[in-house]
């Protein structure tokens, strides 16, 4: 059986977001921390925190919503894994996708680290498309 830790992370965030949870816990890794940093910087999550558990650690991701308690709206409308173990999706600097005509972001792993589509365009690097978030 194959496992995809990044797809698991995105699914946990998507599921918690759908039921308006305050936070969700995810097994930690360096790549997941970098993805959380991008989501926080771009305003899709409120915050994240690393919790030491004696093993690999846990990332507690605090989700973000608009509005009050009664009329809450989700900030994350969609989060999708693009490249996975069975089908890797690589793009060069000239073919970096725009998500929802610029309203969302694409998260890429590049030679310069984990970047958004805008950052990768500015640096002129391509890479593997991890996920789309809008």
Swiss-Prot record:
Record's keyword terms, sorted: Ribonucleoprotein, Ribosomal protein, RNA-binding, rRNA-binding
Source organism: Thermotoga petrophila (strain ATCC BAA-488 / DSM 13995 / JCM 10881 / RKU-1)
Protein name: Small ribosomal subunit protein uS8
Gene3D superfamilies with a match to the protein in the record: 3.30.1370.30, 3.30.1490.10
Top-rank lineage group of the source organism: Bacteria
Family: Belongs to the universal ribosomal protein uS8 family.
Pfam family, one: Ribosomal_S8
Gene Ontology biological process terms from the UniProt entry: translation
Subunit structure: Part of the 30S ribosomal subunit. Contacts proteins S5 and S12.
Gene Ontology annotations for the cellular component aspect, listed alphabetically: ribonucleoprotein complex; ribosome
PROSITE patterns in alphabetical order: RIBOSOMAL_S8
GO molecular function: rRNA binding; structural constituent of ribosome
Function: One of the primary rRNA binding proteins, it binds directly to 16S rRNA central domain where it helps coordinate assembly of the platform of the 30S subunit.
């Amino acid at each position: 059986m194959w496992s995809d830790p990044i797809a698991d992370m995105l699914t946990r965030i998507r599921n918690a977001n759908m039921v308006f949870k305050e936070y969700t816990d995810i097994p930690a890794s360096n790549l997941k921390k970098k993805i959380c940093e991008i989501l926080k910087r771009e305003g899709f999550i409120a915050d994240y925190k690393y919790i030491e558990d004696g093993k690999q650690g846990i990332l507690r991701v605090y989700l973000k919503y608009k509005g009050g308690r009664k009329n809450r709206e989700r900030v994350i409308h969609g989060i999708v894994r693009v490249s996975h173990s069975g089908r890797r999706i690589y793009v060069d600097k000239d073919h970096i996708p725009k998500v929802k005509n610029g309203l969302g972001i694409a998260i890429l792993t590049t030679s310069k680290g984990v970047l958004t589509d805008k950052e990768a365009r500015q640096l002129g690097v391509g890479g593997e498309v991890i996920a789309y978030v809008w």
